[in-house]
Each structure stands twice: as structure tokens, then as C-alpha cells.
Amino acid sequence: MKKLFFFVLIGSSILGFTREVPPSILLKPILNPYHMTGLFFPKVNLLGDTHNLTDYHLDNLKCILACLQRTPYEGAAFTVTDYLGFSDTQKDGIFCFKNLTPESGGVIGSPTQNTPTIKIHNTIGPVLFENNTCHRLWTQTDPENEGNKAREGGAIHAGDVYISNNQNLVGFIKNFAYVQGGAISANTFAYKENKSSFLCLNNSCIQTKTGGKGGAIYVSTSCSFENNNKDLLFIQNSGCAGGAIFSPTCSLIGNQGDIVFYSNHGFKNVDNATNESGDGGAIKVTTRLDITNNGSQIFFSDNISRNFGGAIHAPCLHLVGNGPTYFTNNIANHTGGAIYITGTETSKISADHHAIIFDNNISANATNADGSSSNTNPPHRNAITMDNSAGGIELGAGKSQNLIFYDPIQVTNAGVTVDFNKDASQTGCVVFSGATVLSADISQANLQTKTPATLTLSHGLLCIEDRAQLTVNNFTQTGGIVALGNGAVLSSYQHSTTDATQTPPTTTTTDASVTLNHIGLNLPSILKDGAEMPLLWVEPISTTQGNTTTYTSDTAASFSLNGATLSLIDEDGNSPYENTDLSRALYAQPMLAISEASDNQLQSESMDFSKVNVPHYGWQGLWTWGWAKTENPTTTPPATITDPKKANQFHRTLLLTWLPAGYIPSPKHKSPLIANTLWGNILFATENLKNSSGQELLDRPFWGITGGGLGMMVYQEPRKDHPGFHMHTSGYSAGMITGNTHTFSLRFSQSYTKLNERYAKNYVSSKNYSCQGEMLLSLQEGLMLTKLIGLYSYGNHNSHHFYTQGEDLSSQGEFHSQTFGGAVFFDLPLKPFGRTHILTAPFLGAIGMYSKLSSFTEVGAYPRTFITETPLINVLIPIGVKGSFMNATHRPQAWTVELAYQPVLYRQEPSISTQLLAGKGMWFGHGSPASRHALAYKISQKTQLLRFATLQLQYHGYYSSSTFCNYLNGEVSLRF
């Protein structure tokens, strides 16, 4: 919305300075690229007659401007018989505003007998049509008079309108037509391959005898929006039929920006004739509507229809393959709160790649003359109404996706088929839920989907949750799972139809036929606080006499659970044991209720419970089960039962008992990455401790400063079912050094690290701050050199976990760490190696490291809490030999090579307490195992650049059966 109002503000500002131009002037630029103020010319300077155009091209112009034209022609600014093209208009754009004609086409029009083509393409600047009008007063007394013919196209009236490949906003704002096409009226309209947004804002048309069709766009054959890069915005347009768009066929295909239909109105306010009813608050088509393969979000929100279809009225609708799609707060004064479907072709709504959500769409049922609702049929929630006698609708969701109805749907005729997840690729969830219904609005009308149609579930999940009720006459399950959650009701009913044309009227009844072969109980939903167990119900038969309705049990209903498998699942149909707190025992927990007309009418005693106890991750334990049976007394005469819930005599409750036995985490939740962050800290700090500051003992006092860059790469191999990791670090350091016979140095460094889990996208990004102090001592008059080093490091870390196995989810966490380290090295004096100039000496050292993490909780999918139970402690004893070689060129150089065996003297492996918040399961995470023996190496080279300046390069690391570590440092020292 911010983008929308930005464009509106900019457009209005550009137009503001031209609005007082005398109305007798039609403004059209000449080819010379003068400043915009030079584009205002008197009418005599125009090139050609703009009201008698046949084949006219306006190409490569700096600006096209038409304002305040009031003419008697069809097209206040341009009258076209064949073709008018706007091409390659430069950055100043096209502006047409406040033009007026009593005929059709507020800016561009055509004689009645002609159907010209209008083409706007390849423009760089904005294209804006604002406040244009085609209008003539209409009189009811003589509707056939020529003066009362249709006035259409508030901005453009033509045969074909093509808008393509434009670089900037194309906008139609506050245009008005008396009959149809508040902004555009055409035989064909195509908006394709544009690089910027399309805006229709506050356009309107009103109804005459022919009907006010298309508040923004009216098309008599086909309308298309295809392969555009930016947003398509239809805001606050109004008309009788199709508040924004009216067309026989309409397609929105392959667009990459958001598609928004907001606060459009389909109304009826001038003529009471019924030529075109006020249907489709946003879109009305008479043949087919395709909204497919659009990459971004789609919104139909706050649209209103005077009759049917608060957002969409269509005989056939295909809504498939799109980005996240939302139908919210739409209102139809009759039925079809969001969508109204009338045709006999098969419609399809599928959440293939992202969710589709229907929420708080209202069917107002305004049946009284004053527009009010009947007390017997008040306003209620309604997502979709299918009022066709044949055909069908396919409702589905792709893998890990959801098609969610927070509003009931209505299918009125038995000849219609409803297929849930018909295609094999549709393994997601079709959900009926009452989760968003406020407590004050809880009623059967807001929760129940009741239909005589034939329903079939083939794949995936059909979920009924949070007090929603699905009442069916004919339901068959050939595959998938019927998932029942908190307060869900799946019921059967006897459908009856009355033929009023017969004398006396005849009533035909159809007995219920429901077959289930796999039921899933949504364990997290049923066990949450305040939840109710789901219900399978054979609804009684109602009989109304006068003002009294009584109920009798339906013994003829066929509702079969014979051989049906019972599973325990979560809301996505997966194992529930990681998402449900099963740490405590459950005793005789009510999980499923059955209300039936005769004993074992549903054949529940023949259900298959073999899938209840299956191997799984998460909480471990054992389920046992049994049925509790109750039978109502039969003393009450059936004719006196007025409560439908008391009509059935037989009731069963499934009771489950759970005995817990520990917790086993799923591999996708274990996350060794967090513990491996400690290993990353330790490895980096260890190599820092080995990194010499270039200290040396001199025969005079000195002090100096140092600075340089560093980098490190670590490859940790997978071992013992741990994935391993690789780490990349870069940073810089600065410090000071001082001394004489003993030296002391202090160094500060900052580094940036990315630690990636091997064979996965998971990673931790870190920023570390380190302080390191070093002292070099000469003992026993130079017989032994001792180096003491201490280090402290503080790190800020951001973890990123990705769940890619059939999901597209992620979680993030922020935490910090502290690392402490110390080292001591003992070197004997360097001595010549044989007769060579190479000096050698043995050395011995000890390195101790300690690192721990702060506790933190992730956000995102599957959030977890991490707490360091035991920090990582690692003590090394490197022992080896080093050799040194010097040359005395004009830039003296010294080379040193070290080779050492580096065993682990003591190690405390890190232990990270991890808890999955959804199910409160806890386990201890460990890092990737590291070898206890390694070969360490170091190569350093020092060059004296100037008397007081030296350059030192160091490469060191170690190799083991588990780890390959490489560290590189370059440093310049200035000594005084």
C-alpha cells in the first residue's frame, strides 16, 4: 500500500501544475525535446486532426499531455477509426486528465461502427489517465432515444487495447463512465510484459438499461494480464457487475508482482431493471476466470457485491499454482461471500506452492426490500457458493501446503461433485476450521459446511478442526487421511428435495452414504487446553410441523468405518510425537466420540488400530485403547425430541491410555551445529595462540606497533552419524609490543566467521572480538626461552537452520559466546644442524581452551531452546622441532619451519541441552567428534622492509583423521 500511495502522490504532483490550462487547448508534443513548459501550444499548432485519426503513431516523444478537453466527439482528445499507437515515449510520460465528452471515450474514443486498436508500449515515463469522464444525462421517460445510448470507457473506448513493455506506472485514476468500463471499454484488453505497476483506483460506472459493467475495465470478449513484473492494483473501483473487471473470459497468468483487489464494489443504484445483476464485487466473468502461476501474493479483500460473489462471480474458476493467496472480509449481499460459481464446467482451486486462505467472508442474505436480513437466515460466514446443477469443483493442496477455509462453503445441488486432492501430487491439507470465529459468533451457520453433493477424498489430508463441521450426504474416501481435530464434527444426513410443481408437492429423499478408510486424530489439537474430542455423527431426520421441529434417528444411513485405519497425526499429517507434550502419562483420554442410530451402526468395532503404535521419533511410549459405550433410555417418544443431539440412542467414546518411555529426537532437530560453534571458537583461538607476534630479544629497549590481516579455513569430516562442518574466517588485528631482555605484546583482533554444516544449508554466522597478551622470557641466561600467552574472546552468533526435506521452512537464533585460553611454550636455543646454515631446536608447549555459549531460543519453524550444560574444554601438548634459516641480502629474511605432534591431554566434550518447544522434548546435543591426535605444522617468513619495519607472513594449522585446519596471517611491525 505504501508503494501505491507513493505512485498516486507522485502522479498527482506531476499533474498539478497543468490543471489550469485553458480547456480549448489539446496538448501534444512536437518532436523537439523541449522542457515540459515548452510543450503547451495552441490548438492550431497540433499536427493533424486528432478527431479524425485512421492510422496514427505517436512515437519517441518526450511527453504526451492532454487535459481539460471538453468536446462533443467520441473521444474528448482522440477519435480513432483504425489504429492509435503510443510508443517509446520518454521519461516525461503520458498524462491525460480532466477530459470530458458526452459520448464514449473520455480521452480516446471511436465512432460506433469502428473497432480501432489502441496500443501503449515501450514507454519510459509514467502513463496516467485521471479524472476523465464520458457522461450524458439519462431519462427514464425515453430510454430508446439516441441521446440515451451507452456511454462507455471513462478514459478509453476502442476495439482492442494493448498495453505492453512499459517501464513505469500505468495508472487509471478516478475515471467515470455512465454505463460500462469506468476507465476502459474494449472488445479485447491485454496488459502484458510490463516492468512496472498497473493501478486502477476509484474508477466507476453506473447502471442504465444495459447494465453498469466493469467499474474499471469492461471487455466484451477477453481480458488478460500476463507476465508482468510488478504489482497489479485494483482499489476502490465500483460498478454494477464486476466492481473492477467485467469480461466473458479473464486471465491473470505468470505475473511476478502482488495482485490486489481491495474495496471494490458491485452495486445497483440507478435502474431497477435486471439486465445485469450486481454480481462480483471485484471480478465478474460470464465464461471463465483463470488466475494461475502468479509468483507473488494475491489479495481479494474488503470487496462488496450487491448480489452474488463478494469478490468473484464466475461460471468457471481456475485458481492454481500461485503465491500466497488471501480472500478476506469480502461481502455478498446474497450468497458467495468470496466466490460464487454458476457454471457446469469443473472449477479448480489448488494451493500448489503456497497457502490459500479464506477468512471472514460474509454472505449477508439481504432478502428484505430494505436490504436487511431475515431473522431466520442472518448474515454468516461463507467462502464459496456453488449454485450450479451439474459440474464440480476440485479443491486441493500441494505437498506441505494448505488450502484453508475458516469460512464454510456451500454446494447446493446433489448433481455437483467435490473432489479433495484429486491429483496424486496433491498431498497437502484441505482444511475446514473455526479457529478465527469469535466466541460471540459461534453458530452452526458460521461453522457448518453442509452439502448434498458427492464428495471424494483421493490423496493428502482433509482436515476438520476447531469446531468446524462437515455434513455430507455422499462421501467416499479412496485415499488420504480424514484428519479430525479439536471439536471437529463429521456427520451424515438424509437429503430431501421437494417438487413444488406437483400437486400435492412430492418429496424425494436420498439416504446418506459415507465410507471412511483412514481416520487421523490430530493429537496436538485434541490434547490442547480446553479442547473437545471430535465427533462422528449420524444426524437425525428432522420433521417440521408449524413452528415445531422434531427429530428421529436415521437408521437407514450408511456410515461405515469397517476396516478403517486409525492413526495419530499432527496438523500436517506427520508423526505427532515431536509436536505434542507426551512427557506425562494419559489415562483413559477421550479421543473420539460416535453418535449413531443403532448399535455399532458405524462398525467402529472393526476398525484397524495397528497404526497407533508405530516406530517414530519424539516421545516414546505405548498406547492402549478401548471403547466406552452408553445407551440413552428409550422411554421418550421420538416425536417429542426437539434437540437433534438427543435423537440418537447409541454413543461410543474411544479412550486411549499413554505410558511414556523417554524421548528420541529426529535427526532434523538434533542440530550439532550449535555445539560445533564451540569447536569453531576453540579452533580459531588455538591457532591465534600459536600465532607469534614477531617478538625477539634485543640488546636495547624498544617499543612498536603491529597490524595485519588473518584468515582461517577448517574442514571437519563427518564421523559417527555427525555431519561435520566447514568454517571460513577472515579478520584483522592491531597491537603493540615493547621490551628488551623480556618482551610483552598486546593484540586486539576482530574476525568474521561462517560455519556451515556439511551437506546441508544450515550455518552460523559470527563476529568475534579477541584480546591476546603475550610475554617472552629469557631464562637461565638464555638457555631457555619461555613464552606465556593469554586470550579472551567474545562472540556474537546468528544461527540459521533450514528444513528442506519436503518443506521450505527455516528458524533463526541469536546468542553469544565467551572463550578463554592460555598457552606456555618452552624453546631451547637454536643450534646449527650439522654443517648447514639451518638452525634447529626442540620445543614443548601446553595449550588450554575453555568455551561456552549463552542460552537462547530460536524463532521460526520448529523453535528450540539451547542451554550449555557442559562447556567445551580442550588441553593440548604440542611437542616438536623447529628449524630456522636466514639470509643477509639487502632485505634480510628469516624463515622458520615447525613440525609437532599434538595430542590431547584432556578434553571435555560440549553438551548442549536442547528442547523442542512444541512437544517439550529434551535431549543433549554434541558436536562433531574430533580426533585426539594431530600433526601440527607452521611456516613463517619475516622480511625487514626498512630499519624499523618488518613484514611477517605465517601459515600454520594441523591435520588429523577428522580435521584439516589452515590459518594464514600477514602482519607489519613498526619498531622504535
UniProtKB/Swiss-Prot annotation:
GO terms for cellular component: cell outer membrane; extracellular region. It holds the Pfam family ChlamPMP_M. SMART domains: Autotransporter (SM00869). Residues 695-976 form the Autotransporter domain. Its main location: secreted. Residues 1-18 form the signal peptide. Gene3D superfamilies: Autotransporter beta-domain. It is found in: Secreted, Cell wall; Cell outer membrane. Keywords: Cell outer membrane, Cell wall, Membrane, Secreted, Signal, Transmembrane, Transmembrane beta strand. It is a peripheral membrane protein. The keyword Membrane applies. The keyword Ribonucleoprotein does not apply. Belongs to the PMP outer membrane protein family. This is Probable outer membrane protein PmpE. It comes from Chlamydia muridarum (strain MoPn / Nigg). The lineage of its organism: Bacteria, Pseudomonadati, Chlamydiota, Chlamydiia, Chlamydiales.
